[in-house]
Design a protein with these regions (language model features):
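Active-site-proximal cap/lid insertion segments
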Residues: 2-179
Length: 179
């Protein structure tokens, strides 16, 4: 009987978030600048908005004797890979490791339908460089950690509410292609 905060869809995509960074050129994108919209739409990070919605929902659900169903859709770690600056700073590029199987271009990409026209392949320019891979990983790690902390706050609130022992939690995701 209670539906709240129905928020559908993905954050607004901006062209500056794709095909970057290009070595030797200034990066037009900043993962922590709200001017690019995306996860910063309205000035608050989307994962924090979703967290607050979930906590508010649990407050209403606690007042009822009936069981409740809550579906929380964190769009992170999806692109655009945006996180607060403090999270980006936790992952200096000098400490980001390159995958052992890294190639500037995957030789069979066209054969498997993974051409440069595919949206996830537009996240970085071809040929890929070590700097590009490290920047993309830095942003991915930062947004993943930020989302993880928001989920932790939801779980802390669930524990404090006294409803945790009578709650099932299912965590699923469809992310990872762009990393």
């Amino acid at each position: 009987d209670m539906a709240r905060n129905i928020r559908g869809g993905m954050p607004k995509q901006t062209p500056e978030g794709y095909n970057r960074p290009i070595d030797g050129q200034p990066d037009p994108w900043s993962p922590f600048d709200p001017k690019f919209g995306g996860f910063w739409e309205g000035g608050t990070h989307w994962s924090e908005v979703v967290r607050d919605d979930a906590i508010e929902f649990m407050g209403h659900a606690k007042k009822s004797e009936n069981p409740f169903f809550m579906y929380i859709a964190f769009n992170a770690v999806h692109d655009p890979r945006q996180a607060p600056k403090e999270y980006i700073d936790r992952y200096p590029l000098s400490r980001i490791k390159m995958p052992e199987n890294w190639l500037p271009e995957y030789p069979y990409k066209d054969d498997i339908g993974c051409s440069a026209r595919l949206r996830d392949e537009k996240l970085a320019p071809f040929p890929r460089t070590e700097n590009t891979i490290k920047v993309n990983r830095q942003e991915y790690y930062a947004i993943a950690e930020h989302m993880d902390e928001q989920i932790g706050r939801v779980l802390e609130n669930l524990e404090k509410s006294g409803m945790a022992d009578n709650t099932y939690i299912f965590f699923t995701a469809d992310h990872g292609l762009g990393v």
